[in-house]
Amino acid sequence: MRLAVTIIVLLGALPAQSRTVRVAVCQILSIDGDREGNFRRVEYALEDARAAHADIAAFPESAILGWENPDSHRMATPIPGADSDRLAALARKYGLMISIGVDEKDGDKLYDSAILVDKTGKILWKHRKLNVLAWLMAPPYSEGRPEDIGVVETAFGRIGLVICADTFVDQVAKRVEQLAPDLMLVPYGWAATVDKWPEHAKELEKLVAKRAAQWKCPVVGTDVIGVMTHGPWKGQTYGGASVVVDSSGRVIHILRDRDVEVRTVTLELGRAVR
């Protein structure tokens, strides 16, 4: 798989000194197909994030329609489009940067996407998942393009997005490493059968820690709460236990096991030197 670097510069280069950012890890409940309820739960989390003086609110994968939900083929909207417009309005209302997984319709294709929206409501970046686990839904998500992996310069530094199973792929992880982000925000839909929890959370913890150490930057891996309702993994549980790891690969926060939580953490940005 041939990968190329994509970097978009929106603001001037930031000074090299240490800087911090407050990230609200928004481990919300997402119910498949419940667009209005899921938007309501997103807004509840944003209320908590603003009250905690967060700068960024980080949400899970497919937070609006649910992951691997075949109904998304008819329900999803383009980006930009109705769902991303609503998220932009929420970013403006709460004065927060938002990263969130949003299923995206583009013609007859459905993408498992994530967007980064600044506090003015501008979409700074969109990532389409590459490692889509095609056997879980028919028709499956379309794959993103490797050449579109990138980072974006923001008021907080260079921020990148990948999605869940993208972090399994060493070639994707290597390209992220080459992009030298200051912060990676990774929406997850980390599912397993009920008997595998809470042990399954340890696998998420190890994976996020591995990539943070490789990328030499903090990584926020935000998982969702809920249950899969379609496909071969029907009935599997999203168990939360979202993970925050510092630039050395040290796990510094793990959110609640199988329960909703919004936790705001202060992260020191900048590349680790090792």
Predicted regions and their residues:
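CN hydrolase (nitrilase-like) catalytic-core segments centered on the catalytic cysteine
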Residues: 79-99, 168-261
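Residue-level recognition of beta-strand->loop/alpha-helix junctions
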Residues: 27-29, 60, 128, 223
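Short beta-strand segments enriched in small/hydrophobic residues
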Residues: 19-30
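Cys-nucleophile CN-hydrolase/nitrilase-fold catalytic domain and related Cys-dependent amidase chemistry
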Residues: 35, 40, 44-120, 126, ...
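Bacterial N-terminal signal peptides
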Residues: 4-13
